Amino acid sequence: ASDFVPIDYELDFSRGGDLPPVTVQDDDVTVSLSGKVDRVDGYIQNGRLYLRVMDYKSGKKSFSLSDVWNGLNMQLIIYLYALQTEGLERYRAKLTGELNEIRPAGVLYVPVRDTIPDGERAQDDETLHALRERALRRSGLLSDDIDILEAMEKGLTGEGKFLPVKLKVAKPTKKNPEPTPELAAV
């Protein structure tokens, strides 16, 4: 279960689209970037709308932060940027006028294939179910805010069932005597 709910499907940002294109200017060159977001999920907390971009993939696609750092595979990041910079008025009208700002919650590739997990033929149902869930785990980049992650996946205590995260409890130290959860990339 999740507090994030779908708020847009096939959202077009382009000239004449649902939102304007993303415009990047450098010296005398201006580039307009257009696209269509498969799904946008939102979660409202204290006047802030947290947005998560979902991109459906039928093949195996995984998110690579090094690709983003090298200027490759920027699609989902550009979508989230477009929503954050241009989406406030749209979502005030669509959801509630009480919104003050949009904050990024994450970007995820979502597998949409029926998976047949690798393994032995004679697997019990529980093992098979666990292998299928693992194959359907999303890939992406998420906020490191524990409250936002818990809003994305209720009951998140260790490794995410569908989210690519793992929570660990940090050991108490002299500076911080209380154990605290830490986020680790999976």
Regions found by a protein language model. Name each.
Residues 1-186:
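Structural signature of nuclease core domains in nucleic-acid processing machines
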